[in-house]
Each structure stands twice: as structure tokens, then as C-alpha cells.
Amino acid sequence: MMKVKLNSKIFLFLFFIVALPTFLFSQQSYDITFKIGEIYVDTVVIKSYYGNKTIVIDSLKREKDGSFRLKKDNIHKGIGIFTVGKMDIFTFVFDKENKFEINLDDNWNYLVKGCQENDLYFEFQKANKQIRFLESKTKREIKQNPNANKDSLNNIYNTEVNKFMSFQKEFYKSYPNHIMTKMVKALEDPQIPKEYLNGNQIDTTKKLEFIYYFRTHYWDNFDFSDNRLIATPYFFTKQKTYMNELTMQTSDSIAVAIKDFIEKANQNNGIEYSKYILDYYILMNRKLPFAYNEERFVEIVDRVVSGERTPWISPSEIETMKAEADKIRPLLPEKQFINISEKTLNGKTYNLYDIKTKYTVVYFWSAGCESCKINLDQLETFYKKYKRVYDVEIFSIDLDNNMEESIAFQQKHPFDWIVLKSNSTQLKEKYNLDIEMTPDLYLLDKDKKIINHTPLYNQIEETIRSIEEEE
């Protein structure tokens, strides 16, 4: 029996490993020199965005002339980050021009040699920062000085805003393929047809139709054929809004949203985006043993994964995913749990279906598992306090392969609930039940249908409380 304490860092590392192959798109070699004013450090780090992450590209040592030089192959085109310690100093562009120099003086003025793409990028960033600074300054002056001439301050601000808007418009027109233009355009919402408006407001009688239209056309301004955008912070920001705010947080709705996204991306030469979003949500849900993650994983595999829609996944990999979904399917919420019949260390047999309480907690644990011991302590407190209040029974099975350790632990901790002895091999052979890690808990209703599945005791208590409060 594998004894595992869930660790989010391990999960993130696993995702990083799986996501890396998508970097094979849009890569290039670069030779970049950075000359950075009065930054007295010997080492800096160059990172880049990719989806929801920042990826370390290289650690650079200070050259004899005080500069830092990045010379590296296979860097994804997009936005790079110059980092000192834990502080991101500035961002820059990885694009077609691959040999250039970026100078930053003590007054934070940028001078770029040999790269118009970055020269334009810094020009745009400078104008953007100036208008944001003026906005903050204007609001602060109005707030701090009640006697300030608000009209005058607002007029000054509005004049500068109009100048910036003109600058933006000219920039987008002159440089339609610049990454800055593509990033800003990518975040634009779809235009609202007049049929959904009542004056300047959304017509409340057509609100549902409008929401459907908005979600359906949400990606219209995103250029899926431009793989640079996945290596910017803009893509994941937009994707997060699409999945978390424009999509109902039910398993089937999430799967449909992913399917729709992939179909749109595929139709517009955006297979890298399709791979990313599927990798992200498949891995997020398949590695976490919670009921809602398992439901989502099964729905995504059923609705999204297919040879036609996901051609980058081999037939054997698809078969593996489908088999994994089929293994999880019988243990999803509202499914009937298996009638387990096992013995105590003293040889007495207990059947799960003989328990007639309103709730049953089926708890798989191991005597040598430290996380299990924490859950056991919490369960014991909960059981003593709420056994009669909530009409709940605990049906626990120790899966430790070390019989002596199990005997010693149970003698030291004589629990009041049912404690049975088995092992993972026996459960697999008798019930086709795979318990891959402990602790593992299932909350069942009076008919032994699954309500929740989790490795965390507190979620069991929260679920029961929530049900009781609704009744």
C-alpha cells in the first residue's frame, strides 16, 4: 500500500513535466545582452510566461563589463522577464529579432539596440505607465484635497487619455502584427449586437441569450494562429475568465467549455492552445482524488478526448485515458458503493450494507500512514460528538501490509467504530476496488450511494453539515 500525503508542489511539478512538450512550437535561438544601470548583483534570472506559469529560461552571471548575456536555443516566442532575486525588474519581447541589446539606465530609461520589436514594446509600455500614473495621481489629489479643482484635474487627465488613445490607435494601425497589438486585441470582448441592447444597457428580457452569445463569441478577437500569445500573461487571464466566470462550475459545463474551446482553436490553427488547455484540465483533475475532480476528469475524457478532436494524443494514450475514466466511473457521486464484507483482527465479519444509519463514512487507512493518524484523531472527535446528532457510522479498513504494526496500533487505539483488516490486493481481487493511496474516505447516504469522496476528513464533516443545514 502506497502511503501518500498529498503535496501541491508535487502536483505542480507533475503538470510542468507534462506541459513541456507543447513548447516545441514557436521556438527560436537568442543572443541578448542586458546592461542594467546600478544593479549590483552577480546573478540574474531570465524567465518567460507560458500559460499559467513563469518558466525559468536561464540564470546569467555578470560579465566582466558588468553586462549579462543570454545565449540560448529553443526559447518560445512571447514575453520574457528579467528577474533579480524574487523581484521581476522588467519584461521584454522574444520574437523574430534574435540578437540585440537592452540597456536600462539608473533613471529607468530603456535603450534598445538591434531590435525594433523591443524598442516599440518599451515605447508602448512607457506611454501606458505614464497614463496610469496620471490616473492614480489625479484620484489621489482629488481624495486628499477637498478644495482641489476637480474639473481642472479631470480635464488634464482626459486630455492625456485622448492623446494616449490616439497613440494606441496609431500603434495598432502601424504595427498590426506586433505582439503588443496582438495581446491587447486578444483581451477585447466581442461586440454586442443591437438586438441584445435596450439603450446602452443589456436588455434584461434577453439576458440568457446575450450570455450565450457573449460566451460563444468570447474568443473571436483572439488569434489562435499566433502561438506567441500563449507565452504572455494575457492568454491565461482570458482563459481563466472563460472557464471560471463564463462557464457554470459543473462537470458537464466545464467539459463542454473545453470542447468548444478546442474546436475553435483547432479550426484556427491553434493546436498549441488546444493541447495546453486539455493538459491543464486533464492533469488538474486526474491527479487529485476528490469527487468533483474525478467527475470533471470523466466528463472531459468522455466529451473531449477523441482521435478527431485531439489528434496529438495517440490511440494508445486515448485508450489509457478511457480505461482510467471507466475505473473511476462506478465511484462517482450518486453511484452505489460496493458492499464490502471483511473481518476484524479478531475474526468477526462486518458487511457494509448491514449498517442502517443515515450516513456512513467508509475510511481506508494504514496503520503506518502519518496522514491517516491525523484523520483518525479528527474522526474520533467528530464521531463522539456527532454520532447520534447526525446518525453517522464509520466503517474503516486498515490496509497496512505489516500485520504486527496494525495489531500494535489497534491495541493502542481501541476505536469505538468498526475497524476491519484487509489490503489493497485483496480489495482489488474481491471488489475490483483500487485504493491507490491512504487516507481515502467515502461518504455514503442511507442507501449506500456515494455523496462525496476525499482524502480529507474535514470535507466529510463539511458535507454532512451542509446537507443537514439544507434539510
Spans of features found by a protein language model:
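Bacterial Sec-dependent N-terminal signal peptides
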Residues: 1-34, 453, 470-471
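A non-transmembrane, solvent-exposed segment enriched in polar/low-complexity residues
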Residues: 27-176, 183-187, 191-221, 225
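Non-catalytic, surface beta->alpha helical segment in thiol-disulfide oxidoreductase systems
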Residues: 81, 436-440, 446-471
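Structured, charged N-terminal subsegments at the starts of enzyme catalytic cores
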Residues: 204-270, 278
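N-terminal "domain-start" segment that seeds a small globular fold
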Residues: 314-352, 463-470
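Short active-site neighborhood of thiol/selenol oxidoreductases, capturing the structured segment around
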Residues: 350-379, 393-395
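Structural microenvironment flanking redox-active thiols in thiol-disulfide oxidoreductases
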Residues: 373-413, 425-430
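Short, internal strand/loop/helix patches
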Residues: 410-446
